[in-house]
């Protein structure tokens, strides 16, 4: 990762050490492509003793822009897109022949993060409202995940749990985290407005709530590609009299805004699973400073549960604690889920078939590589 590697580092870059199924072809690899060759002595095989993977050579063609890569795929210059693309491309792909579209369930949950505990120098009367859990609850009630999935993802997504654990992780997903708020959206709006009528009852002529005579407006940090999300959140939050606006987060949002409490709300993607909770739960909910706990949440009971979950050697107890933690996360209304987006990727079928759909993965995955077969005559 050095921009000016010395001779020793250069040698290591071009002579990697590993035990995988393919090895780097240094003679054919360069700045525009990476070539891997299947190693004949790979230890895993199929039951009949044949190679586990059917692909002899993999060439990664490096493109700087996704639209160029998509054009190359449609023209037949490459076989597979090794990246997830926007759901906006689904209609385009559906019109093309010889394409396999993988619309796989995702593992990435988009959340709306509240700056509930900014450093003292970044506090102001409007931002102080976010310190009130009831105020955050009211905003959470106004979020309609189904509408976001329909309009932002073109239907290519699923509802996300308030406990931020995927329901497909059946061993430790806790459905109780999703029973804290009413299911019916109209009932949710009524409850949200009743809460806010107590906290900030005054409104302007447009129906937006006021604090000290000024409209309550929050800015949501996001990337240019997330402006659609903010636009539909504007519509939803207007129903409870709260104004939100998009704010570009720039190239280094952590240093510029997030680590320094210089934000109201921000969009943040999270992925939690058994393999990462020991590290990611503290980073998102416990650690202050330069961590993913952007809103600087402090909850001693939650912290204690996370700490015990990390260090217990009893797997049953770990699962039990994971189930206890999810409603605690949900009750904070700190990282409120918006949706879980599908992983959309595509491959050509005129040269190879046998592509597999795998949760959380693009079509370029281990299962596909094990099942690929060349089309007869090609």
Segments the model singles out, each with a brief description of its role:
Residues 1-52, 57, 68, 189-190, ...:
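Gly/Pro-rich hinge or "lid" segments in bacterial periplasmic/extracellular proteins
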Residues 105-121, 163, 253-311:
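Acidic-aromatic pocket-rim loops
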Residues 8-13, 42-92, 234, 243-251:
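Ligand-site clamp/hinge motif
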Residues 25-37, 61-122, 146, 150-152, ...:
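Extracellular/periplasmic solute-recognition and catalytic clefts
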